[in-house]
Amino acid sequence: MIKISLITICYNAESTLLPTLESVARQTYPHIEYIVVDGASRDNSLDLVRSICPEAHITSEPDRGLYDAMNKGICRATGDYIWFLNAGDSLRRETTVQEVVEAIEQGSAPDIVYGDTMIVDEERKELGLRRLRPPHNLRKKDFLRGMLVCHQAFVVARRIALPYDLSYTLSSDYDWCLRMLERSHENRQVQTILVDYLAGGLSNQKHWRSLRERFAIMRRHFGLLPTLLAHISFLFIRKR
């Protein structure tokens, strides 16, 4: 049977963690390995994990940031597929993991499975689907138009998974998805919403740093001219 490694990264996330844990606990699919990588929280995050997901594999220690913690999650995973579900985000339905596994089992096992994402607020009120929508046949070059698949709806075969690049502090997930698409031989879409993603804005300073990082990542993967043309296109779309 296919085993799915669900990985949650948290640090003092007591206020947002409950929906995440409950969504994992209610999954009907039995072959789930749940890994929680905690950055030595000082609140009740770990008590919540232990009470709602008692079978979770917990690591709690200081780290060098989000992507360092995600690398720890990859190292600890033993499942066939890796799926990151951050604190505050939740699986859409109790059958969501089962639906992903059924998609994997349709033919040869894909390297990447992906789906759609619903944006929710802190009250779990739906704000709408992401503006960038996943295409039916996802390819690396599609990410020139932005991150078309939310990281939490991007399920990767462990056999191709590489560590996150810690030289990026805000956009390493974008770089990681590009590198996974580069290594993937087959990507398969699940034509449904997989994840409820908790909306949260970056500060202006972090927002601009994130944009600069993303430009550098795009240039590295696609070259300078395609990256410039893509950003001109972004500006045109925003002004329409």
PLM segments and residue spans:
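Cell-envelope/extracellular polymer assembly enzymes that use nucleotide-activated donors
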Residues: 2-5, 33, 175
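Acidic helix N-cap motif at the loop->helix transition within catalytic regions
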Residues: 15-18, 43-51
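Short, acidic, metal-binding catalytic loop of nucleotide-sugar glycosyltransferases
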Residues: 22-31
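A conserved acidic beta->alpha catalytic loop
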Residues: 30, 38-47, 86
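Glycine-rich, basic loop-to-helix element that forms the pyrophosphate-binding segment
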Residues: 60-77
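Short aromatic/hydrophobic "clamp" motif used to bind/position activated sugar donors
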Residues: 82
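Conserved donor NDP-sugar-binding/catalytic core segment of glycosyltransferases
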Residues: 94-127
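Conserved nucleotide-sugar donor-binding catalytic segment
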Residues: 129-213
